[in-house]
Amino acid sequence: MHMYAQHFNLKLLPFENVPDPLFFYDHGDHARIRKQISGSLQSGRGLIVVTGPIGSGKTTLSQMIKADFPESIQLIWMAEPPANSTDLYLFLAQELGLHPASSEKTFVMRDIRSALMTINSQGKKCLVIIDESHLMSEDVLNGIRLLNNLEEGSIKLIQLLLLGQDELMEKINKPEMVPFKQRIAALESLGKMTTDGVLKYITHRIQVAGGNPNLISATGWEAISIAFSTGGTPRTINSLCDRSFNVAYERNKSAIDAKDVYEATQRMGLITDVFHYIIMLNNEERKKQESQDITDQSIQESIASETASNNEQPLSPNIKKAEQSINPHPIGNEIPVIPRARMDVSDKSYDEIANAIKEKYEQKNLKISVILLLL
């Protein structure tokens, strides 16, 4: 298990790109298509085609369909299409337990039809699922068309489900493929998840892995929403979230934030607007810091102003009374003459003290007599 799973106290890695039914999340299309296939199988309608962009969950859907059907269904699953129609028939014959005497298409198809008749007579059905069908050649598509023609009355002897990327429809829409297109009983398309669906999908996978959605912070969720503002596919979502968790782990964080998501988009080469969101967050943080600095400066200036105001408070009545008793005349800027007889110091000491006091208080222009400071 990856170290980030332990770091975030997860029991499982939540965003591995493997078709694990444990993490399956039905965002709407899957349930509809599974219901469509089930109904088609019951009614024997025949050929169903499902397309969708890369990573939209087609393979996961096929795995879920395999798990849906009981043992009475003869299920044949192909991870990718064969190179040609002959290989297709030989593969089906082998899966049905047949040993054709010849590899000629006519004889192989005869044996396949016989086996399918036996299956249907037993009250069973056969379903063939072919993944990555967009890789099919026109020869293989025509081989599928011939298989779809195998019928017993109004009942199709074999049910066919083709899963492929949108390129499959480009092939089907060609003029020469009209006979094939006319035989499609149901055509479905897996679309991208909406932004709301993306967030629910991520939450679901985190919870299945034993985690809490709080592992992604508010800015992290917002960045993910921006990254998938036009929708997302399971594969891309898994890749981005897996890398975001890994980035946060490398930075020893307890939760994924917008910067981690942005770093993940950079590592994946995704072009999103997350960068602009980061710039906005940085600007808000800078403004908040500037506002705090202004507040701190205002507090300091207020304290300094209050201190200066306290230093300029008028003398108390007792000091004024004492001053007036010594010098009844109004005090101006001049330093009053003090009789030396009252000072118990030498002439030199007196002069030094008086001059120092005079110089000090003339500079500050304080209206207070030196005698009060010497007393």
Regions found by a protein language model. Name each.
Residues 209, 213-375:
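C-terminal alpha-helical "lid" subdomain
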Residues 78-82, 172, 185-198:
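Conserved AAA+ ATPase "SRH/arginine-finger" region at the nucleotide-binding site
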Residues 106-113, 125, 201, 213-228:
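Short conserved motifs of the RecA-like P-loop NTPase core
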Residues 114, 121-162, 174-176:
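Conserved Walker B catalytic segment
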Residues 10-13, 17, 74, 84-102:
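Conserved NTP-binding/hydrolysis module of P-loop NTPases
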Residues 1-44, 299:
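A short, basic N-terminal segment
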Residues 44-64:
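Walker A/P-loop nucleotide-binding motif
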Residues 66-68, 168-183:
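Short regulatory helix/loop adjacent to the ATP-binding pocket of P-loop NTPases
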